[in-house]
Amino acid sequence: MSIDVRAVEADDPAAVATYCALRAAVDADEADTPEGVAWEEAAYPGEVWRFLALLDGEPVGAATTGRMHVYSRDHPRFYLGLWVLPESRRRGVGTALYRAASERARAAGKEGFRCWASEAHPDAVAFVRGRGFAEEDRSKAVALDLRGLRASAPGAMPTATAPEGFSLVAIADRPDLVPGVHRVAVEAFPSIPTVTPMEPGTLEEFTARDVYRERIPLDGFFVAVETATGEAAGYANLIFAPGSTAVAHHDMTAVRPAFRGRGMATALKRATIVWALGAGLDELHANNDEENTPMRSINASLGYRSLPDEIGFTGPLAPEA
């Protein structure tokens, strides 16, 4: 039995296609696409690495590591994603990929990894725990069945109404609001309940990651605008699941602290739901940190159902050979 780990070059279409296919085969929720790889390479050049593992010449595993998109370059950890086909597990494939990713992280001066695993995948949880990873946080995953909503009585369909003194507009119609949306992120991100607050980054970084991204529909990206000043008070956007036009995730719902307590977040989230219904989507998914009770309460009030928790882990690099 031989295990060979190879780097996936972004300009190698065949290798990228194999990498994406393996991720999708192991976990459709963690799929990637060639378009997604191209976006990541353009947004984070030289900061993301991908690997394939071959068992006796057959591709059976994939991994990726690099800068976490929502943190600065000097964050002490890289993220780690690792996928091995079920029939090829417990044969050293995952360990070989972990070592390859660790070599890259060590060369970049990183002290460890951050990774995520769903309770729906106990093998993944066991793998990282067995290598010294510890749970750092936990997200409550939920989903909204849009097909069921369409089949319900017309009076049960959600509507979106802005609080008095505000309007809800799509960024597709008001691209001039993008700097204001960035200001929302700068003011709101530090106070969103989470173990490690996200960093919005510069306007350029934020725009590439959270606005003009290939899976973010701009006509489903809503901004709450104060009528009196024209300022952006909050925003909510969606991001399609990789390779899908039927399932999307709530990428962010954020409100500037000065405008909270008026039902703004609920109105914005409702706007994305109404858009998704009209666009023919089947489901919306959301993940919120366990301690983010305000947003979790909004999700519950809108009829989202619980899914298995997503666990965030931190852990060490593999020992040097």
Residue ranges of each PLM-predicted region?
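Short amphipathic alpha-helix that is part of the acyltransferase structural core
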Residues: 1-39, 52, 59, 158-201, ...
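Conserved donor-binding loop and adjoining core beta-sheet/short helix segment
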Residues: 8-13, 20-120, 233-247, 251-256
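Short loop/turn motifs at secondary-structure junctions and domain boundaries
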Residues: 41-45, 212-217
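Core beta-strand residues in small-molecule sensory/regulatory alpha/beta domains
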Residues: 54-55, 225-227
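Acyl-donor-binding surface of acyltransferase catalytic domains
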Residues: 58, 69-71, 86, 90-174, ...
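Glycine-rich acetyl-CoA-binding "A-motif" of GNAT/NAT acetyltransferases
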Residues: 58-61, 123, 136, 229-234, ...
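Conserved acetyl-CoA-binding loop-helix of GNAT-fold acetyltransferases
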Residues: 90-103, 130, 255, 261-274, ...
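Active-site/acyl-donor-binding loops of N-acyltransferases
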Residues: 131-151, 220, 274, 279-321
